[in-house]
């Protein structure tokens, strides 16, 4: 049975121009904050889609909080359109690259994290963090497994890798269980 995997965060980056006047952009955009002594970029929060955009003087833009790449693209195009209408020279429909996706799912059981921590590529320090960290090399992702059975997969570039990673982890846990019990 296919696990129900839900994307909870997509981080993308793009280039919207060069030499952006962040003070001017902050005046134009609603919900924008620019405090260069605190952070070198302009932070703009949108409610629809619900994302945060970080715009840097170099023209680099990062968007975080989207539930899918399409939402990030909508948000970026919305901001670019607003800034262009105010006279800024920016790139139309900039190419957007997924940097990271985070997905969640359930194991469907409460795993013994101490047993799993005997496997290679795992870290488990319950005094520091309640989840077991499992680093896969193929696909290159990090899987966090919690005692409740909740699983968080991070470092994804495409959603298909979440299914591949979950399948690998499930098989490994099944083999470990057969070996131990």
Curated annotation (Swiss-Prot):
The keyword Translocase does not apply. Sequence repeats lie at residues 7-83, 98-173. Gene3D superfamilies: TATA-Binding Protein. The keyword Repeat applies. InterPro entries: TBP (IPR000814), TBP_archaea (IPR033711), TBP_CS (IPR030491), TBP_dom_sf (IPR012295). GO terms for molecular function: DNA binding; DNA-binding transcription factor activity. Pfam families: TBP. GO terms for biological process: DNA-templated transcription initiation. Keywords: DNA-binding, Repeat, Transcription, Transcription regulation. Belongs to the TBP family. General factor that plays a role in the activation of archaeal genes transcribed by RNA polymerase. Binds specifically to the TATA box promoter element which lies close to the position of transcription initiation. PANTHER family: TATA-BOX BINDING PROTEIN. This is TATA-box-binding protein. It comes from Methanococcus maripaludis (strain DSM 14266 / JCM 13030 / NBRC 101832 / S2 / LL). The lineage of its organism: Archaea, Methanobacteriati, Methanobacteriota, Methanomada group, Methanococci. The gene is tbp.
């Amino acid at each position: 049975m296919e696990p129900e995997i839900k994307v909870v965060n997509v981080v993308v980056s793009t280039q919207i121009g060069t030499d952006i006047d962040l003070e001017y952009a902050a005046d134009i955009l609603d919900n924008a904050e620019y405090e260069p002594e605190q952070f070198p970029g302009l932070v703009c929060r949108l409610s629809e889609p619900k994302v945060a955009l970080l715009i840097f003087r170099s023209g680099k833009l990062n968007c975080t909080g989207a539930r899918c790449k399409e939402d990030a693209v909508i948000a970026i195009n919305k901001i670019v359109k607003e800034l262009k209408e105010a006279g800024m020279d920016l790139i139309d429909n900039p190419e957007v690259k997924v940097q990271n996706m985070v997905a969640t799912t359930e194991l469907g059981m409460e795993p013994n994290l101490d047993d799993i921590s005997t496997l290679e590529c795992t870290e488990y320090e319950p005094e520091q963090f309640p989840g077991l960290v499992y680093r896969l090399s193929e696909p290159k992702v990090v899987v966090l497994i919690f005692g409740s059975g909740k699983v968080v997969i991070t470092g994804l570039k495409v959603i298909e890798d979440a299914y591949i990673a979950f399948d690998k982890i499930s098989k490994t846990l099944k083999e470990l269980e057969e070996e131990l019990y």
